Structure formats: structure tokens, C-alpha cells
Amino acid sequence: MPEELKNIRKINITVARKIHKDAEYYASPGLWPMRSPFLTSFKPIEIKNFSVKTNQKSFDFFPYVSGTNNFIENNRSINIGGEIFWDIDSQSKLDVSLNPDFGQVESDDVIVNFSANETFYPDKRPFFTENQSLFEVIGQDLRFINTRRIGAIPDKCSDTNESHQGQCKDYRYDSTDINVAVRYTKKGKINQYGLFTSLEDNSLFSRGRDFFAGRFKKNLDSTKGTIGYLVTYVDRPSIQRKSFINVADFDYRPSDTSRLFGWVSQANIEEKGQTNNGYGFRIAYSERPSKEFFSYYFINYHDKNFNINDMGYIKKYDNISIGVNFDIEKTPEEKSSLISVSYTHLTLPTTM
């Protein structure tokens, strides 16, 4: 949470309990998570501020040693590494992962996809899920930072590369070891900063990739929203490809019932001596004049060179999409019922 210099901090809370056997749900205040607004309707309370002392520090180090015995290939390996979590002060935090071992991560859900579009899988590795919210800039089927790219299958063995297909088809590993990952964040009351980097180890057929990201976010006012800037850089030496992405994002609230948000981005991709520039933007506006009515409008544009998949995720580019959504709800005292929903979404290619 941002620093609060006063002795009292204001927060909003809710308490809920669900009894599955009776299909009953209790909450105070009476809110249902699937109905908007939810978070903004929490009950406000005042608590003693825990962060009055700005010199509070903590340092945690979790080392590990693991061994692997491959009976099929008759080889053995021992891995040594660890993770460091350093709360420098109430605003700053440094996280470091050295030669991480993610063997405890649960597997992904099985999703059957017969389309030509990539399926997005959220990252479940602890280091890449904790304290990562500052770097999140997203859109419709789009994320500028997708940490699943880090430690993924080596470039030389990917489906898009044919130089080692004969050798790689017998390659038993679908991941790349990570040498180090570092994340630094500083979250003040007005300004927030973040730096992120991860360096991969070399594999049998490929050199490791290098990932870098920088983030700045500024609170315009307690009610007026935020503006921010994100930059990412990826070096993929095995396929002679470099990616440089710039993103400017905004979230503005003209009033308590309206919101205007989105981003503008430029992608610079250099591959084998050729450079391509791509552009994209997203603008969305929502309005809730009353509890019964909600409207949402958006436009997305991604040109044919707006490929951010080196470090991010985009389901499809070379298109423009326009959408409108209306929700009308009737809210009696004891229950709520949805009267009508009207949704229109049109997607067109940018090149005919």
C-alpha cells in the first residue's frame, strides 16, 4: 500500500462466508462478487497506520538445493540457488531469484484450441506472480508483459524456427533455465517506479534470452486517476531478433460515475538486419449514472507490425475492433435480477 504519514489509515473491507452444502452466501455489507460495483462498495473503516515508521526493513533469504537423476539418459545434476526478498523501507522492495527451481508449480489447465491463435496461460511461478501488479498494462486479449515467455522453450527449438528441427524433435525439455531474475519497485503516494530483468541460461541449441522492463506511474489526484509509461526490451540472439516496446497508459475519472482509460503503444522489432515499426492503441469509456444502468464503449487498433509477443501476449494483431456494452439491472430489496444486456463487438482487419 502507498505510504500514509498520518496515524490513522482509511481502508475498505468486506466479510463473506459461503456454505456450500446449503448453497447459502452471507456478506457484510450485502455484496455479490459477480455484480458491479463490488470493490468500491466495501465498508470504509479506520485503522491504526502500521507504516508510520518509514525506516522499517526486513530481509529474507530462502536457499535451496535440489538433485535430479535421469535414469533414461543416465545423467545426474545438482542445482543450487535461492530467492531474496528485501523490504528496503515502507515504499521500496527488491526481489531477486538466483537459478530458480520451479518444480513445485502446479500444471496448467487443459484447453483445447483448434484455432491459429495462441492460448494465454497465466504464470503460476511464485516469483513472477508476487509484487508484479505495477508492471501490468493490459488490453483485450493483450498483455505487454507475459512472464510465461521467460524460461520458455528455446528459440532454436520453437515451432517457428526450422534450423534445428531435426535435432530438436528429440529434445526432451520444453523450458529454459533462468540464471537470475531481479525486480525492484518503489510505491510512493504520488509516484511509483519499477525495474525488472531476467537473464536465461544457454541451452543445448540456443543462447539464452535477456528480458528488461521499466515502469513509471503517477497518481494525478486521489480521484482523478493515473498516467504511466512502460518500456520493455528483449534480446533473442539465437534468431537475431530484438524487441523494443514503448507504452503510455492513462486512467482518468472525470467524475465518480465515469471512467476514461487506455493506452498508446509503439513496437520496434529488429530481426536479421530488418526493422519494422508497429503501432496500437486502446481507448475505453465507462459510465454508471445509477446502480441500475452501466454502459461501456471501446475501440482497439493493432496494425500489421504490432507484434509484442517477444515479452508480451497478443492474441491477434492487424485488426481494429469496436465494442459497445449496456447493462440494465433491477435491484429489489432481497435479490437482484438482470433485465437486459445488449452487446455489440465488431472486429475488422486493418488491411483489406
Predicted regions and their residues:
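Conserved small/polar residues in nucleotide/adenosyl-binding loops
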Residues: 344-350
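Outer-membrane beta-barrel channel domains
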Residues: 1-48, 57-68, 74-336
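Acidic, proline/serine/threonine- and glycine-rich low-complexity intrinsically disordered segments
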Residues: 340-341
